[in-house]
Amino acid sequence: MSTLNIAVAGSSGRMGRALLEAVERAPDMRLSAALERSGSPYLGKDAGELIGSPCGIGITDNVDTALDGSQVLVDFTRPDGTLVHVDRCREKNIKMVIGTTGFSPRQKEALWIASRDIAIVLAPNMSVGVNVTLKLLETAARVLNEDYDIEIIEAHHRHKVDAPSGTALLMGEVVAKALGKELSEVAVYSREGHTGEREAGSIGFATVRGGDIVGDHTVMFAGTGERIEISHKASSRATFAEGALRAARFLADKRNGMFDMQDVLGLRQ
């Protein structure tokens, strides 16, 4: 069994630590680098100490040297930082698994351009369960059509900085596409005051932030006399970390291109 050398960006964060633990558990992977932002109090420390198991890999903010010897960089950071990492990976021909959310259209375009040269899995949610849920939503939207009003409710921990979540937006995109629409044309992101009646065919979003909620998503199809709710609730970041490593394995034999978890899981039709 060949070993895949994995670099982790944002290694001291909540997802970073979950990734370190997942790499340590994986028999076919080895931690090759642990990255942190400049000024982080964790710089210079053994990355393994973050999860109670020293590994001999020091945490660094030097992207160039850290990526030497790595095959895949797993990045759950923030858009600006991810774009810096993309440029370095492109220079060094290193594949990327990107779980960062909150990209602007221009930033997404930069990722697509980079994928001409390197292989990238870009997914706002790496959970296997969420990606199965997306297939269920696609089927439900196609069958129920516009006879049902669609609302998407998501909840996350108090530290999340973007809203709606990338997963909620992806769910909206899947549903809108199944209805033959663009999400940008039908999305309603806030309601306040005298809003008037609900506009037919719109897709509403509601956001909750609080506590340590890992991630809850519910898509409601509300019809006359009945309501269908399709939900996914994450109780541990380990599910996202395991999905990210599955994505890294998928990229092992890919030279370039943009992929998502539907590709990784073989759900693409």
From Swiss-Prot:
Keyword Oxidoreductase among record annotations: yes
Functional description taken from the UniProt entry: Catalyzes the conversion of 4-hydroxy-tetrahydrodipicolinate (HTPA) to tetrahydrodipicolinate.
UniProt cross-references to Pfam families, sorted A to Z: DapB_C, DapB_N
Active site residues per record: H156, K160
Biological source species: Nitrosospira multiformis (strain ATCC 25196 / NCIMB 11849 / C 71)
Binding site for NADP(+): R37
NCBIfam families in the cross-refs: dapB (TIGR00036)
Molecular functions per Gene Ontology: 4-hydroxy-tetrahydrodipicolinate reductase; NAD binding; NADP binding; oxidoreductase activity, acting on CH or CH2 groups, NAD or NADP as acceptor
Protein name: 4-hydroxy-tetrahydrodipicolinate reductase
Annotated metabolic or biological route of this protein: Amino-acid biosynthesis; L-lysine biosynthesis via DAP pathway; (S)-tetrahydrodipicolinate from L-aspartate: step 4/4
The keyword Ion transport belongs to this UniProt entry's keyword annotation: no
Compartments reported by the entry: Cytoplasm
One annotated Gene Ontology cellular component of this protein: cytosol
InterPro entries: DapB_C (IPR022663), DapB_N (IPR000846), DapB_N_CS (IPR022664), DHDPR_bac (IPR023940), NAD(P)-bd_dom_sf (IPR036291)
Binding site for (S)-2,3,4,5-tetrahydrodipicolinate: H157, G166, T167
Family: Belongs to the DapB family.
EC number: 1.17.1.8
GO BP annotations, alphabetical order: diaminopimelate biosynthetic process; lysine biosynthetic process via diaminopimelate
SUPFAM superfamilies with a match to the protein in the record: Glyceraldehyde-3-phosphate dehydrogenase-like, C-terminal domain (SSF55347), NAD(P)-binding Rossmann-fold domains (SSF51735)
Catalytic activity: (S)-2,3,4,5-tetrahydrodipicolinate + NAD(+) + H2O = (2S,4S)-4-hydroxy-2,3,4,5-tetrahydrodipicolinate + NADH + H(+); (S)-2,3,4,5-tetrahydrodipicolinate + NADP(+) + H2O = (2S,4S)-4-hydroxy-2,3,4,5-tetrahydrodipicolinate + NADPH + H(+)
Keywords of the record: Amino-acid biosynthesis, Cytoplasm, Diaminopimelate biosynthesis, Lysine biosynthesis, NAD, NADP, Oxidoreductase
Binding site for NAD(+): G10, S11, S12, G13, R14, M15, E36, G99, T100, T101, A123, P124, N125, M126
